[in-house]
Amino acid sequence: MAGHSQFKNIMHRKGRQDAQKSKLFSKLAREITVAAKLGAPDPAMNARLRSAIIAARQENMPKDNIERAIKKAIGSDGDNYDEMRYEGYGPGGVAVIVEALTDNRNRAASDIRSYFTKSGGNLGETGSVAFMFDHTGLIEYDAGVASADDVLDAAIEAGADDVLSSDTGHEVYASHDTFREVAKALEAKFGEARKAALIWKPQNTVPVDDETGEKLLKLIDLLNEHDDVQNVYANFEISDALMAKMGG
């Protein structure tokens, strides 16, 4: 399961990389605003907004900030953001998916393309690497919420596809189509999840050496530092020693 553990760590590098909470809060607020604008401003009626609020709470984002982001969606003077997905290959031919919310498509595309190029990779067309990933729902709970067997039983009953339990928590995977229903059923049984979101999960991971791995982690960090970038996914596997060295 080393590859899976690293995939989780790579996904979570964003929180550690955003040294300034203000940058992280800005990204979280942007997702809340977009989610509220695309659906109802009530999280009880808007699953994406609820997921965004859960993510904000996990990062201790103040309640006032969350409410302000929702109100921004209701007002007519708020910024308009486009949801963009960029796909390409990083060092070593590793597949990378970048999700962004931007108010300037040309700027975002130019910046992200330059990051790929400088790292020795290249930005491709939409769909060029997505087939190597599953767009799936991930629902996470702390380990103490219930036993592995209880979570598994509840997940199966709710219609989940897979469950992985460890001493760090429970991860429930559900298809794109059933994710919201599964999350709702689990919340009714175990309470609010610590994470509930649609992700790009690599179908397989590609082992790379430390030199390539270091370049890839630097690319991911560079992408995450961009104001428009919300999430970065990649399908590589590196040594635990390098992950620890690079702060994973």
Swiss-Prot record:
Q: Which domain of life is it from?
A: Bacteria
Q: Which UniProt keywords apply?
A: Cytoplasm, DNA-binding, Transcription, Transcription regulation
What are the annotated GO cellular component locations?
Answer: cytosol
**Coiled-coil intervals in this record?**
none
InterPro entries given for it?
Integrase-like_N (IPR017856), TACO1_YebC-like_2nd/3rd_dom (IPR048300), TACO1_YebC_N (IPR049083), Transcrip_reg_TACO1-like (IPR002876), Transcrip_reg_TACO1-like_dom3 (IPR026564), YebC-like (IPR029072)
**Locations listed in the record:** Cytoplasm
Which GO biological process annotations does it have? Answer: regulation of DNA-templated transcription
Chain residue ranges for the region called Disordered = 1-21
User: Can you name one GO molecular function term for this protein?
Assistant: DNA binding
* PANTHER family per the UniProt record, alphabetical: TRANSCRIPTIONAL REGULATORY PROTEIN YEBC-RELATED (PTHR12532:SF6), TRANSLATIONAL ACTIVATOR OF CYTOCHROME C OXIDASE 1 (PTHR12532)
NCBIfam families hit by this protein: PRK00110.1, PRK12378.1, YebC/PmpR family DNA-binding transcriptional regulator
Q: Which family does it belong to?
A: Belongs to the TACO1 family.
Protein's name according to its UniProt entry: Probable transcriptional regulatory protein RPE_4771
Organism, scientific name: Rhodopseudomonas palustris (strain BisA53)
